[in-house]
Structures are given as C-alpha cells and as structure tokens.
C-alpha cells in the first residue's frame, strides 16, 4: 500500500512538472505571437507614414483605404462662355463649361442624361460601401471644369468619375470610351498611370455589361477637367448622342443601370 501511495505521489509530481512546463511554453508562445503582431503593426504604421510623406512630397494620389468617390455629371443646363486656363499656369484657355451635346433622336440634353446616370451611380456606390461626393445634383448650377476638379482635389478622393456622352459628325460612330492624361501631361503627369488604370477598368467593365463597342482609353492632354486634377480621374464617354440607336439607349433606364453596374465593377477592380 505504501509503495502504491509513493508511486501515485511520484506520478502526480511528474504530471505537475509537465503541466508547469507546458504552461511556460504556452505563455512564451503567446508572448512571441504578441510581439510578432506588434512588430507587423508597427511596420505597417511606418510604411503608411512613409507613403504619406512620399504622397505629400510628390503630390501623388492617395488610395489606400480611401473609399471616397467623387462623381461629376458633365456639363449643366446653361453653359458659361467665360474663359479659364486649361491647366495650372497655362496660357491657353477654354470656356468654363458648356451645355454639351443633344440627342439626335430624343432631343435630350447630354447634361440631363449625365445627371440621371450620376444619381444612379451615387446610389449604387453607396449601397456598395463607398462614400460619394457629388459635384452637382441638379441642372441649375454654374460650376466650371476647373472648379469641379478643385472639389475632387480638396476631397482627396480615391477616384474622380466624370460622366459624359459623346457626339460625332457621322451618325454611324458608336461605342464607349474613357479619357485619361498622358505621362507627359504638363499639368498632371503624376496621376497619369493611376488615371489610365482607372479608365481601363471602367471602360472594360461598362462594355462587358452593356455590349457596347469598346473604344478603349483615349489619351488627351487638352481637357481642363483632367488637367486641374491631383487625384485619379477618368472621363467616361458613355455613348454617342449622334447615333440614333445609342441616343435612345442612353435615355433608357435599364441601359443606364447597366452602365452604372459596369462603372461600379470597374471601380472595384481598380481599388483591388
């Protein structure tokens, strides 16, 4: 009996020692994990701080966790023929803002179509978890292209979406395109790459949703609404109002929904 008690005591003693050792290892492991998490968190913080300094120093667009999208429904009910520089420090000028094109079959103003799509896009983006800032929500405004870009710049948005409709001398011209600045743009070359990527994502996804002819990304350095930008920007030419069929489609609510779905998918792809 004494031997049995002795063996039991020794067994309990060994078990206790093993348990204590396991607890020490567990504590050590947890401490190491906490140190690792703290290190990774600190490295991310340092990386973000460095990126912020770089962005401020070189005036680069900030994306990161930014979920703010600025939407500009191009044009307005009444144009403003007063002149403004096409870019910072430019001697060349353009009208501050025009009324835009008119549908060849519907007679509908481009500015109104742009606004209809913009309001739908706002709703869809907000439902998708984005913050949205609108340049205009009505036709009765007087906002120049430079002023529109300044609103986007001041917001430091992740993307500036400028909605337009196209027009051409030939009624056979059709399709969707986007516009971005070149890497040699004298006013906003720092956003050229990001703007191209945004433009490519948007036009590809719109055409995938609508079946419209994909005219790709047009590079243009003469657009005031682009040249004044410091944030990634794209002008979306949704279709041709000079084309009888596309003009009707651009006023069709279900077709507008397809355009909106394409833009949202494009923004999602760009933000990944």
Where in this protein do the model-derived segments appear?
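Catalytic-site microenvironment of enzymes
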Residues: 2-272
């Amino acid at each position: 009996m004494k031997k049995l008690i002795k063996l039991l005591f020794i067994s309990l003693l060994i078990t206790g020692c093993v348990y204590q050792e396991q607890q020490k290892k567990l504590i050590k492991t947890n401490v190491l994990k906490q140190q690792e998490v703290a290190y990774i968190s600190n490295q991310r913080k340092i990386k973000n701080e460095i990126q912020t300094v770089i962005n401020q120093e070189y005036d680069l667009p900030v994306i990161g966790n930014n979920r703010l999208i600025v939407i500009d429904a191009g044009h307005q009910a009444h144009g403003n023929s007063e002149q403004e520089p096409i870019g910072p420090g430019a001697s060349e000028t353009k009208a501050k803002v025009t009324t835009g094109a008119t549908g060849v079959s519907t007679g509908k103003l481009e500015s109104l179509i742009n606004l209809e799509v913009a309001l739908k896009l706002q709703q869809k983006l907000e439902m998708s978890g984005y913050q949205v800032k609108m340049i205009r929500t009505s036709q009765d405004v007087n906002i120049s292209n430079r002023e529109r870009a300044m609103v986007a710049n001041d917001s430091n948005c992740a993307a500036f979406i400028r909605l337009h409709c196209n027009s051409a001398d030939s009624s056979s011209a059709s399709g969707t395109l986007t516009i971005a600045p070149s890497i040699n743009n004298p006013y906003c070359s720092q956003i050229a790459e990001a703007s191209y990527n945004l433009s490519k994502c948007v036009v590809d996804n719109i055409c995938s949703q609508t079946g419209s002819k994909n005219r790709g990304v047009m590079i243009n350095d003469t657009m005031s609404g682009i040249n004044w930008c410091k944030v990634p920007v794209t002008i979306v030419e949704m279709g041709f109002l000079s084309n009888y069929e596309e003009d009707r489609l651009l006023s069709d609510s279900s077709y507008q929904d397809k355009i909106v779905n394409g833009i949202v998918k494009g923004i999602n792809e760009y933000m990944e």
